[in-house]
Amino acid sequence: MKKLVILGSTGSIGKSTLSVVEQNKTEYEVFGLVGGKNVELMAAQCLLFQPKFAALDDENAAKALEEQLRQLNVKTEVLSGQKAICELSAHPEVDMVMAAIVGAAGLLPTLSAVKAGKKVLLANKESLVTCGQIFIDEARKSGAQLLPVDSEHNAIFQSLPPEAQQKVGFCPLAELGVSKIILTGSGGPFRVKPLDEFAAITPAQAVAHPNWSMGKKISVDSATMMNKGLEYIEARWLFNASAEEMEIIIHPQSIIHSMVRYIDGSVIAQMGNPDMCTPIAHTMAYPKRINAGVAPLDFFKLKELTFIEPDFARYPNLKLAIDAFAEGQYATTAMNAANEVAVEAFLNERIRFIDIVNVNRTVVENIAPVQVKEIADVLHIDKLARELAEQAVINL
């Protein structure tokens, strides 16, 4: 049995991961669960999966969890704080770590798993957006296996030759006959909405994604296509791709999850129903296959598959992300932090939908260029960018 730690078990990806475990109980043992403050859900997960450890970032929440588990007679040991979570990620008994904590909070525990040479199922975008070079270098040093969980990157991974799959982060695409990585995106819920109506978009409208079931933050990112911008940055790092080797296409049906174009004219695509359990199951079992509990794709129900070029006037956040990568790691780190603040402000109705990109752009343009050499640099830039973003929100 493979022993698994889930960083972010109470979130959307974490819950989907546990549902895949339920489908394959003889293959996987949940060794540790990590969450933020959701005591009720964590207690329910501990009751169901009986992990050896459960960790919450918040100390008071951890104490409340300990009390609940005692009443439920669950023997799971409760930990709290970043240090304990990092130690759990690197625990010698652990085979694989699902890195699904949203935001900068997931950086250190994910890096801890990478340094320990674990099989790391990477669902935390920020790891590569803010620390791409650091993560790739550490994985090469430790021998950690990085497997992308994001549906698009997982699709690209599956469409690449086996040699490239063994060299995530440093695969020579051109040598393997790859000409383009084609990243697809649905275009979100406002793909055909008139631009003059964007100022009136509400949080409720923005979180209603047409195809995927996701958390609020990532749903807003999908609506602005910042999500695709972050995925562009991730793909550049994961697949060692140049700007010329990248292509972004809007595919509203979300059936083709991404593609790889080869120099002989072939295009290999990965398809399936839009359900995160598929890429989760793929990374958990790789190089084998397991049941993900996902309905098979019914080709006879597909009316059409359409492809559209992205419009940067409609999706300025996408252009901002592409340009930020060209600027360097400091710019992508600052943009990511600013976006977290801006999206939170929008969800709390402090700013309009169209102001999200204005906050992000203000921060990227005003942050001082810094060379990112270690994670302390990343955390410093992240902190500065959040302060700048908060000020930008107030100034709007």
UniProtKB/Swiss-Prot annotation:
Pfam families: DXP_redisom_C, DXP_reductoisom, DXPR_C. It is an enzyme of class 1 (oxidoreductase). Its EC number is 1.1.1.267. It catalyses: 2-C-methyl-D-erythritol 4-phosphate + NADP(+) = 1-deoxy-D-xylulose 5-phosphate + NADPH + H(+). 1-deoxy-D-xylulose 5-phosphate binds at K125, S151, E152, S186, H209, S222, N227, K228, E231. NADPH binds at T10, G11, S12, I13, G36, K37, N38, N124, E126, G215. One of its GO terms (biological process) is isopentenyl diphosphate biosynthetic process, methylerythritol 4-phosphate pathway involved in terpenoid biosynthetic process. HAMAP family: DXP_reductoisom. This is 1-deoxy-D-xylulose 5-phosphate reductoisomerase. It comes from Actinobacillus pleuropneumoniae serotype 3 (strain JL03). The gene is dxr.
